[in-house]
């Protein structure tokens, strides 16, 4: 599996950096964003390092977005959000901070941005993130057993 030693996501995948995982399979991990826009903000990351979406095989891109959609359903169910944003940035000009492909699944609530701007990012403790992740994992468990995430 191709990894980059200076990449925070590769370090997390290898178990060398802390994270709060929501989901993991052979190809992807989903983890809580440490600085969430809203609580439940989850990052879906391929386990193989790709700098951007254009460097990923198309079949893997398709699987990533199918999984992102299913994770979004579990997130909405678990934290009672009103909607969600899927975000994926490619390159510095597009505000890609970590040069490892990832999809942001951001729960949204009616009136969470009354002035039309994004809500401010929060700083969440690992304990807070762990509680939210557990709730999301419970929402994944039933759909997973019925083939929902496969």
Task: Give the predicted meaning of each segment.
Residues 1-150:
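HIT superfamily nucleotide-processing domains
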């Amino acid at each position: 599996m191709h990894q980059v030693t200076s990449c925070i996501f590769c370090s997390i995948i290898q178990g060398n950096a802390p994270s709060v995982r929501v989901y993991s399979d052979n190809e992807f991990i989903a983890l809580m964003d440490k600085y969430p826009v809203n609580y439940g903000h989850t990052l879906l990351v391929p386990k193989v390092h790709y700098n951007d979406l254009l460097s990923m095989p198309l079949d893997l891109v398709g699987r990533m977005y199918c999984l992102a959609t299913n994770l979004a359903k579990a997130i909405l169910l678990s934290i009672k959000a009103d909607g969600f944003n899927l975000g994926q940035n490619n390159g510095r000009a597009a505000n890609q901070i970590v040069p490892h492909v990832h999809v942001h699944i951001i729960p949204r609530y009616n009136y969470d941005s009354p002035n039309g701007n994004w809500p401010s990012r929060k700083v969440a403790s690992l304990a807070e993130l762990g509680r939210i992740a557990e709730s999301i994992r419970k929402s994944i468990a039933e759909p997973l057993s019925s083939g929902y995430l496969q």
